[in-house]
């Protein structure tokens, strides 16, 4: 039996459906509304998407070309349009996720107005955006299915089976989300409470970083401060307990390390014996070996293999790591997280360089062979300059003539048509596939692309509309393109739910329904 017919049968079997005082309730309409609202709660979504993500992780282990991707979205509408576009262009949304960026929540969704990425925004704003994203995606399901139901009603007997097949094989817009909890917004109890709220909103994957919560910085800014492993592992446990309490047993934890760019620690790690995790953490500290006679009032000392050393402490009461230890600390962080409950790791880097990433992953995989990475293809990188410089360096090392290029000025558009620039663009084009194969990257994401696309498209419209083009600036560059490129939002009344509203009015009021989609609706021009 088809999915649609099964739904009709189930609706028809409702015990009260045939009572005389329910005579106006149509089981077909009930069946349609149920299919349009497959996911009743955020927990339903989290369970469904966690299962998808786990299967994707298993598939990637067998074939690295099956990596996954996402774009950061700061509003439900943006996430909805992304998934509608993916289905339109590729016919499926398999291995395409959502990403929720703490940076964009801070910059765009706080009631305080725009904030830096320092965990100053409201804790509840994260779960609120997750809920908003899935509300819009559920509406995308209802809208598309509503169109198919109307198509079914108008189809000839010969065509009905084809339309019903589309309904039965409908692919939902609901996809996994990787959601940023920053450093947990407080202690482990605060982390647990916030994670629980995020899961209840639909999150199947939570990303948490090893920075100090109240000193948190954007991963691509200076002044980052990490915490000893024991504190971070307690927060991983808090997130896992939140998943398990809510019945999302296969929820995913992404453990992010910021150690590559973090030169400071808030505290010395507790160590009970040489070589334990606390001792390994402290071994990266920048210290001075001193004698007892050189001790000063207020000094903090460590006994390291029988020698007394003094960690370098700043006026901020933070301790300094030795320079050049970032990669080693990232490797230790990642191995430790994977051995203590994390499913995926995230190493925040200062540049998009496959060699750098793969070198760290090679060391991690010696201990955890199936280690997988989530990687931030960050807009904070100047991708053009980075890859042109990488190509410049490779050409120089191989003996090619690079005398016509200025390495520090390779962003200049005068180089756009050169061999170097084209080679760099080729490397950017294949970066994700290459990194998935060579560096163990399971998931590629861009944290805040839609922040930038909103700014760019608005700038272009403002330039044309308020300039000499006037109304043509909108018509030629927006509406005409929407029509010709099949952008669903050109019929904005339909996208906002007007046609679904008309369907419901007919369900509820029958022939007395006052509908918005009549002959005088200007959307008929499209």
Placement of each model-derived feature along the sequence:
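Alpha/beta enzyme core
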Residues: 5-439, 445, 469, 509-526
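A SIS-like phosphosugar-recognition module
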Residues: 384, 452-453
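Mixed-charge (polyampholyte) low-complexity IDRs
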Residues: 466-472, 483
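Short acidic/histidine-rich active-site segments
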Residues: 446-451
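Gly/Ser/Thr/Ala-enriched C-terminal appendages of enzymes
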Residues: 456-457, 469, 503
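Extracytoplasmic/secreted cell-surface and envelope-processing proteins
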Residues: 355, 455-456
């Amino acid at each position: 039996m088809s999915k649609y017919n099964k739904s009709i049968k189930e609706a028809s079997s409702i015990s009260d459906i045939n009572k005389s005082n329910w005579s106006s309730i149509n089981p077909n309409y009930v069946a349609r509304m149920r299919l349009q609202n497959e996911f009743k709660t955020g927990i339903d979504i989290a369970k469904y998407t966690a299962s998808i993500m786990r299967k994707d992780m298993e598939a990637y282990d067998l074939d690295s070309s099956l990596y996954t991707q996402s774009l950061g979205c700061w509003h439900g509408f943006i996430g909805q349009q992304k998934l509608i576009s993916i289905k339109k262009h590729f016919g499926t949304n398999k291995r395409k996720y959502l990403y929720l960026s703490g940076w964009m929540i801070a910059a765009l969704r706080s009631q305080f107005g725009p904030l830096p990425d320092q965990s100053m925004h409201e804790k509840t704003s994260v779960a609120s955006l997750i809920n908003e994203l899935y509300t819009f995606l559920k509406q995308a399901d209802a809208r598309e299915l509503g169109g198919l139901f109307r198509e079914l009603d108008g189809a000839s007997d010969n065509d009905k089976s084809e339309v019903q097949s589309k309904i039965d094989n409908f692919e939902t817009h609901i996809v996994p989300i990787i959601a940023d909890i920053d450093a947990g917004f407080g202690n482990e109890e605060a982390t647990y409470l916030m994670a629980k709220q995020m899961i209840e909103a639909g999150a199947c994957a939570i990303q948490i970083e090893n920075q100090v919560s109240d000193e948190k910085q954007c991963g691509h800014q200076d002044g980052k401060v990490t915490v000893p492993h024991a504190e971070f592992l307690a927060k991983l446990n808090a997130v896992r307990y939140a998943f398990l309490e809510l019945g999302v047993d296969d929820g995913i934890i992404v453990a992010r390390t910021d150690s590559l760019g973090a030169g400071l620690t808030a505290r010395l790690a507790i160590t009970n014996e040489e070589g334990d995790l606390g001792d390994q953490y402290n071994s990266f500290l920048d210290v001075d070996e001193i004698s007892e006679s050189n001790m000063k009032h207020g000094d903090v000392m460590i006994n390291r293999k029988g020698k007394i050393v003094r960690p370098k402490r700043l006026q901020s009461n933070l301790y300094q790591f030795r320079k050049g230890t970032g990669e080693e600390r990232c490797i230790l962080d990642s191995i430790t997280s994977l051995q203590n409950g994390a499913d995926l790791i995230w190493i925040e880097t200062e540049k998009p360089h496959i060699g750098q990433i793969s070198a760290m992953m090679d060391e991690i995989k010696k201990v955890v062979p199936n280690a997988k990475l989530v990687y931030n293809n960050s807009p904070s990188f100047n991708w053009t300059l980075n890859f042109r410089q990488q190509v410049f360096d490779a050409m120089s090392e191989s003996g090619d003539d690079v005398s016509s290029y200025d390495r520090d000025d390779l962003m200049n558009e005068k180089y756009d048509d050169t061999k170097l620039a084209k080679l760099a663009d080729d490397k950017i084009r294949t970066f994700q596939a290459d990194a998935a194969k060579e560096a163990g990257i399971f998931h590629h994401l861009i944290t805040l692309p839609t922040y930038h696309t909103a700014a760019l498209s608005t700038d272009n419209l403002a330039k044309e509309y308020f300039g000499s083009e006037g109304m043509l600036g909108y018509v030629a560059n927006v509406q005409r393109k929407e029509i010709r490129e099949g952008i669903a939002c050109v019929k904005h009344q339909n996208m906002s739910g007007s046609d679904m509203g008309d369907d419901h009015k007919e369900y509820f009021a029958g022939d007395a329904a006052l509908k918005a989609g009549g002959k005088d609706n200007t959307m008929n021009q499209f």
